[in-house]
C-alpha cells in the first residue's frame, strides 16, 4: 500500500446519491484514487446494499471482486501514530450519535485529519482527531490494488447522450428559431422608429411620413405578436415531446428492472427521479434555443450595433468576460446546492409515500404526531436547502443586474460625450441603448445555461444510478428456447441469500411434476416465499439451477416464463379502476365473459361482486374500499384468468374465513390440469394436496403426503398437532 498523506493532494470526491449510498460512495472514492470509476449502482450490486445501507463486509466483498486487497481492522486513535499509515482508507462512524456512516480519510497534518464525507452537505473537510474520535467506531477498512489490478471505467450516459432526442425535434426547433428571429427583427425596427422620430421626423416636421411609418409599425407589431404566439405554442409542443422521450423512457426502464432493485430502494427515491428528469428537459430546451436562437440574435444584433457605433460596441463587449466571471465563481456552489436540494427532496418524498401507505398502522398505533414530526423535520431540511439555493441564485442575479445597469450607464455616459462632439446623434444614442438589450439578453441566456446545465448534470447522475441497473429483459431477444408443454419444475441444489447473511435457501433440490398440487409449509422465516420467488425468477440462485423441463430458467424469456408460472403474492395489490379492469389485468388474450364468470366462481367472489352497486363496473380505490378477504379473492380470480399452467399461491387465502377458504381449495383442486403450489401457514390446505414439502432454516427437511408425514412424527407432525 502507498502512503499519500499530503493535504494538498487532489481528491476525486464522489457524493452519495441516496441516503443509503454512503458506503458505496466511500468505496467509489477509494477506487477513483486508483483510477477505477464505477457507478454507485454497480457498487451497490457488488456490496449487496439494502434498505439498511452497506455493511463493512459488503465493502470488503465489493473491493475484493474488483481485484483489490482489503484489510478491515478495529483500532483506536493510536492508529494515527503509525508513520507508514496508508491513505486513503475508509472509516466507519456514527454521526450525531445515531446514524451509521462512512468517511474516507485522506491524510493527517498535525492534529487534523483530511476527511471526505460522502454527504455533500459536508464534502471535503478538515476534522480534529478529537472530533473524529467522538464519531469513529474504530472500524477501518484499508484497500489497495493487487499486483494483477487494472483500472476500469464504466461507461455512463452523459448529457450528450440526449443529442438524438434533440435532433428528432429539428423541424420544430427550426420553426421556433425562425419565429423568434422575426419577432426580434420587428423589435429592432421599433428601435429605429424611435431614432427616426428624434433625428428626422420631428426636426423636419414630416407628419405624413410619421403617420405612414407609425401605422406600418403597428401592423408589424400585430404580426410580431402572432409570431410570438406561434413560438410559444411550438415551445410547449417541444417540451411535451421531450417529456415523452425522457420521462416515458425512464418509466419503461423502471418496469423492466429486476425485483432486487425495488427490494433495496425506497419508493420516494425512485419517484423523485421524475423531478430530476424535468431538470434535464428544461436544460435541453434551453440549450437548443440558446445554441440556435440566442447565438443567431447575438450575431445579428452585434452586427447592427457595430454599424451604429463601433466604439460603443467595444465597450459593450466588456460585459462578456464580466458575466463569465460571475458564472464561474458560482459554478461549484450551485453544483453542491443542486445535489443537496434533490437529495433532500428524495428523502421527503420517500417519507410521505411510506407514511401515506402505512397510515392505517400509524393511526392504529396512535403515532400521528411521531409521523408528522419526522416529515416536519425532513420538510424543514428541504426548505433550508431550497432557501440556500434560492438565496445564492438571488445574489448571482443581483450581481448580473448590477453589471447590466452599470453597462447601460457607461454606454450613456460615453455616448453622451460622442453626441457632444457631434460624432453621433441623440437618436442614434437612444437607438443604440435600446438595441443593447437585444444584445445582452441572449448573452445572459447563453451564460445562464451554466445553472441549468449544472442542474441537468446532477439530475443526469441521479438518473444514471437507475439506468445503469440492467433490465431483467436485456437478453430476452437472445432467448430462443421454448417451454415444453407439461414440463416438470426442477430445482437442483439451489442456494440463495440476501446480502452476505445466512442462506435463505440452503442447498434445496425438488421436482414438481405437471398437474401436481404441492403445499410448502413451515414457520415464518423458513424460506417458503423466497423459494417460490426463485421459481418464478424474481431472484436468481447463487448456486444450483432451476429448470422447466430440460430448459434452465436462465435460458428462458422472462415474459414467457411468467406467462407459464403465475405468482400470487402474500399482499395482493388492487389497482384504482373497476373490478373488471382489475380482473382483466394480465388476462390471456381472447378472455371471454364466460371465462370471467368461471374465475370469480372459483375464487368465491361472484356473489360479493353482484351485491355491489355497479357489479363488475364498481370502482375500487388503490388502498381498497373492500375487505382484505375480498381483495385476496379478486386477486385470485385475476390469477386464474392469466391461465398459466403453473399457479403459485403465497398465503393467498390467509385473510379468509375457514369455510370460504375450504370452498376455494375445493374449486382449485378440480383444476386437474394445473400445477398449483400453495405456500401455507394453515395446515388445513396441506391435508388436501398431493404432496407436502416442509421447510426449516432454508432447507426442505420433509417431503411426503399428509398421512406419511404424520406417521413419521417429524417436524410437520409437530406443526399439525400444535
From Swiss-Prot:
It is found in: Cell membrane. The chain crosses the membrane at residues 171-191, 210-230, 242-262, 287-307, 311-331, 401-421, 429-449, 518-538. Pfam families: ABC_membrane, ABC_tran, Peptidase_C39. Gene3D superfamilies: ABC transporter type 1, transmembrane domain, Cysteine proteinases, P-loop containing nucleotide triphosphate hydrolases. It comes from the Bacteria. The active site is at residue 22. Belongs to the ABC transporter superfamily. PANTHER family: ATP-BINDING CASSETTE SUB-FAMILY B, ATP-BINDING CASSETTE SUB-FAMILY B MEMBER 6. This is Mesentericin-Y105 transport/processing ATP-binding protein MesD. It comes from Leuconostoc mesenteroides. The gene is mesD.
Amino acid at each position: 500500500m502507498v502512503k499519500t498523506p499530503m493535504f494538498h493532494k487532489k481528491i476525486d470526491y464522489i457524493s452519495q446519491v441516496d441516503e443509503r449510498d454512503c458506503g458505496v460512495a466511500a468505496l467509489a472514492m477509494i477506487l477513483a484514487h486508483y483510477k477505477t470509476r464505477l457507478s454507485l449502482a454497480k457498487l451497490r450490486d457488488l456490496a449487496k446494499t439494502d434498505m439498511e445501507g452497506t455493511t463493512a463486509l459488503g465493502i470488503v466483498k465489493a473491493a475484493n471482486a474488483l481485484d483489490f486487497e482489503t484489510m478491515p481492522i478495529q483500532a483506536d486513535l493510536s492508529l494515527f501514530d503509525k508513520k507508514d499509515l496508508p491513505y486513503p482508507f475508509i472509516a466507519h462512524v456514527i454521526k450525531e450519535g445515531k446514524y451509521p456512516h462512512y468517511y474516507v480519510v485522506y491524510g493527517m497534518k498535525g492534529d487534523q485529519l483530511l476527511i471526505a464525507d460522502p454527504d455533500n452537505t459536508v464534502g471535503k473537510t478538515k476534522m480534529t482527531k478529537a472530533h473524529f474520535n467522538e464519531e469513529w467506531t474504530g472500524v477501518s477498512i484499508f484497500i489497495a490494488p493487487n499486483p494483477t489490478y487494472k483500472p476500469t471505467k464504466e461507461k455512463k450516459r452523459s448529457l450528450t447522450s440526449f443529442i438524438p432526442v434533440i435532433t428528432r425535434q429539428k423541424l420544430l426547433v427550426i420553426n421556433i428559431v425562425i419565429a423568434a428571429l422575426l419577432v426580434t427583427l420587428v423589435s429592432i425596427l421599433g428601435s429605429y422608429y424611435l431614432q427616426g422620430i428624434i433625428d428626422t421626423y420631428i426636426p423636419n416636421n414630416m407628419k405624413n411620413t410619421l403617420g405612414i411609418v407609425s401605422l406600418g409599425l403597428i401592423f408589424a407589431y400585430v404580426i410580431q405578436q402572432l409570431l410570438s404566439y406561434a413560438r410559444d405554442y411550438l415551445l410547449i409542443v417541444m417540451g411535451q415531446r421531450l417529456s415523452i422521450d425522457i420521462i416515458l423512457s425512464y418509466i419503461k426502464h423502471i418496469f423492466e428492472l429486476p425485483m432486487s432493485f425495488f427490494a433495496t430502494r425506497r419508493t420516494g427515491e425512485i419517484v423523485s427521479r421524475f423531478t430530476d428528469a424535468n431538470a434535464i428537459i428544461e436544460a435541453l430546451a434551453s440549450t437548443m434555443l440558446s445554441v440556435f436562437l440566442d447565438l443567431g440574435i447575438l450575431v445579428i444584433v452585434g452586427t447592427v450595433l457595430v454599424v451604429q457605433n463601433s466604439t460603443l460596441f467595444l465597450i459593450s463587449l466588456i460585459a462578456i468576460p464580466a458575466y463569465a466571471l460571475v458564472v464561474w465563481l458560482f459554478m461549484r456552489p450551485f453544483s453542491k446546492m443542486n445535489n443537496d436540494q434533490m437529495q433532500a427532496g428524495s428523502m421527503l418524498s420517500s417519507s410521505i409515500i411510506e407514511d401515506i401507505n402505512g397510515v392505517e398502522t400509524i393511526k392504529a398505533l396512535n403515532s400521528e404526531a411521531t409521523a408528522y414530526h419526522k416529515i416536519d423535520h425532513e420538510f424543514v431540511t428541504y426548505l433550508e436547502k431550497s432557501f440556500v439555493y434560492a438565496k445564492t441564485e438571488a445574489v448571482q442575479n443581483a450581481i448580473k443586474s448590477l453589471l447590466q445597469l452599470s453597462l447601460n450607464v457607461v454606454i450613456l455616459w460615453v455616448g453622451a460625450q460622442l453626441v457632444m462632439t457631434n460624432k453621433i446623434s441623440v437618436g442614434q444614442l437612444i437607438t443604440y441603448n435600446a438595441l443593447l438589450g437585444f444584445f445582452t439578453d441572449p448573452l445572459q441566456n447563453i451564460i445562464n445555461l451554466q445553472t441549468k446545465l449544472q442542474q441537468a448534470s446532477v439530475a443526469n447522475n441521479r438518473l444514471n444510478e437507475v439506468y445503469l441497473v440492467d433490465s431483467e429483459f436485456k437478453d430476452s431477444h437472445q432467448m430462443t428456447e421454448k417451454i415444453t408443454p407439461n414440463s416438470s419444475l426442477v430445482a437442483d441444489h439451489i442456494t440463495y441469500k440476501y446480502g452476505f447473511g445466512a442462506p435463505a435457501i440452503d442447498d434445496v433440490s425438488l421436482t414438481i411434476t405437471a398437474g401436481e398440487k404441492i403445499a410448502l409449509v413451515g414457520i415464518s422465516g423458513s424460506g417458503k416465499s423466497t423459494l417460490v420467488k426463485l421459481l418464478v425468477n424474481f431472484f436468481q440462485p447463487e448456486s444450483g439451477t432451476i429448470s422447466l423441463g430440460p430448459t434452465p430458467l436462465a435460458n428462458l424469456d422472462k415474459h414467457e416464463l411468467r406467462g407459464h408460472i403465475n405468482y400470487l403474492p402474500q399482499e395482493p395489490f388492487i389497482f384504482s379502476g373497476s373490478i373488471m379492469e382489475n380482473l382483466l389485468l394480465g388476462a390471456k388474450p381472447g378472455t371471454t365473459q364466460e371465462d370471467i364468470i368461471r374465475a370469480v366462481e372459483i375464487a368465491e367472489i361472484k356473489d360479493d361482486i353482484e351485491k355491489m352497486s355497479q357489479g363488475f363496473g364498481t370502482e375500487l380505490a388503490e388502498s381498497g374500499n373492500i375487505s382484505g378477504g375480498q381483495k385476496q379473492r379478486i386477486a385470485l380470480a385475476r390469477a386464474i384468468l392469466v391461465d398459466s399452467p403453473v399457479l403459485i399461491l403465497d398465503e393467498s387465502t390467509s385473510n379468509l374465513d375457514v369455510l370460504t377458504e375450504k370452498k376455494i381449495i375445493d374449486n382449485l383442486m378440480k383444476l386437474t390440469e394445473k400445477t398449483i403450489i400453495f405456500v401455507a401457514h394453515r395446515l388445513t390446505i396441506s391435508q388436501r394436496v398431493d404432496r407436502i414439502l416442509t421447510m426449516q432454516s432454508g432447507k426442505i427437511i420433509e417431503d411426503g403426503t399428509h398421512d406419511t408425514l404424520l406417521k413419521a412424527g417429524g417436524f410437520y407432525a409437530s406443526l399439525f398437532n400444535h
